[in-house]
Amino acid sequence: MSDVYADWESVIGLEVHVELNTKSKLFSCARNRFGDEPNTNISPVCTGMPGSLPVLNKEAVRKAILFGCAVQGEVALLSRFDRKSYFYPDSPRNFQITQFEHPIVRGGRVKAIVQGEERYFELAQAHIEDDAGMLKHFGEFAGVDYNRAGVPLIEIVSKPCMFCADDAVAYATALVSLLDYIGISDCNMEEGSVRFDVNVSVRPRGSDELRNKVEIKNMNSFAFMAQALEAERCRQIEAYLENPNKDPKTVIPGATYRWDPEKKKTVLMRLKERAEDYKYFIEPDLPVLQLTEAYINEIRDTLPELPYDKYQRYLHDYALAEDIAAILISDKHIAHFFELAAAECKNYRALSNWVTVEFAGRCKTQGKNLAFSGILPSSVAQLVNFIDKGVITGKIAKDLADMMMESPEKSPEAILNEHPEMLPMTDESALVAIISEVLAANAQSVIDYKNGKTKALGFLVGQIMKRTQGKAPPNRVNELLLAELDK
């Protein structure tokens, strides 16, 4: 069956809803803040009261323009708003204000690394719209919280330019990182700040046809996205294989599904609506949104260094491995931490390992982010410098790192001043004595080494380091051990 599956490929496009981190909502002065008591951040506009009129939030427009500039899209000098009509309890007006025909951004692309290769994922458009409220279920009844109603969104629509789950996850990851870098959203997927609607169809490999697509709604996890895409891919392929003589348009009807993580399958929600079902028409209460080139350029000039550009710089300036550079730039706060530390430590590879592996592992067990742990970048730089200068051994450095996690305000130097017993052995006569004891206790290993078995040397070094509790300088141990063995 897997060989049959290999003859098919997925065609995937994503619609990403991004909540903008403005202080107020898109068309009213109601507060835009997650987690408050239900129905406390509301106004006549976002609850659809008769006679209330929308007023466009300038900051939301600025953030949408900033996104357009970041993806090198075409920011429209003229765009407008439309009403998308539908009835649902969380939409008190019975319509959404969106941009159907004239979006604020057209085109653009997102750069990503997929399995070590550089990829560009093309965008169709990005438009501004307001969010709906939220239904909360309580046993046999449900309540509606309108705190989210009217929260500003940009919906980012990709072209169907992804052909497997890995592509989709790489694009989504790169997009969220980009949004975080430019600071237009808090990108908290658990709180729904970024939600993915995934459109997927399948076709015989080598074909260029676009068959009926299925939409999987409201994905808020990269892992669930990958699982859902693979499950839906298999479902559609099996349907086509079971109905080889049917018109493909009738085999997979356009529909909306959700992902059930417990059953590991997509579940039908409803058949797909057509655009005309929403009865789009121009929003009569909002004027055309008119921008100037000067205003767009002013916003473009505020763009920070973007993730992919930072990734390339890390490869070039710091000579880091691709996987390490990718880990560092995936979190802008960690990247900033690393750069501050790199200003004081030139062993960039060792430093990156301490940031992404040693301290990252310790922080993960405590549910922390190194950038917010209280540990200073200069302290991590000092730790690596101490290793390079022979002030401490690698074993001592790890013990120091543990103590830094407990007392983040203290530098390695301060900890060593308080605990001089942690410093490495400097008494060579004592070290030579330990080496002699180890050689006497491991005569067979000495014979093996002299017979050309180099692994025996590593064993002897390990025994010496064990006796010294990791405090002996490894380079000096090797020198003295070889001198003793050559006698």
Swiss-Prot record:
For this UniProt record, give its keywords in alphabetical order, as a comma-separated list.
Answer: ATP-binding, Ligase, Nucleotide-binding, Protein biosynthesis
Q: Does the keyword Ligase apply?
A: yes
Under the heading Gene3D superfamilies, the entry gives: 1.10.10.410, GatB domain, N-terminal subdomain
- Which InterPro entries does this one have? Asn/Gln-tRNA_amidoTrfase_suB/E, Asn/Gln-tRNA_Trfase_suB/E_cat, Asn/Gln_amidotransferase, Asn/Gln_tRNA_amidoTrase-B-like, GatB, GatB_C_1, GatB_Yqey_C_2, Gln-tRNA_amidoTrfase_suB_CS
What's a single GO MF annotation on this record?
A: ATP binding
Catalysed reactions, as listed in the record: L-glutamyl-tRNA(Gln) + L-glutamine + ATP + H2O = L-glutaminyl-tRNA(Gln) + L-glutamate + ADP + phosphate + H(+); L-aspartyl-tRNA(Asn) + L-glutamine + ATP + H2O = L-asparaginyl-tRNA(Asn) + L-glutamate + ADP + phosphate + 2 H(+)
Question: EC number(s) in its UniProt entry?
Answer: 6.3.5.-
* GO aspect biological process, one term: translation
- Family as reported in the entry's similarity comment: Belongs to the GatB/GatE family. GatB subfamily.
Q: What is this protein called?
A: Aspartyl/glutamyl-tRNA(Asn/Gln) amidotransferase subunit B
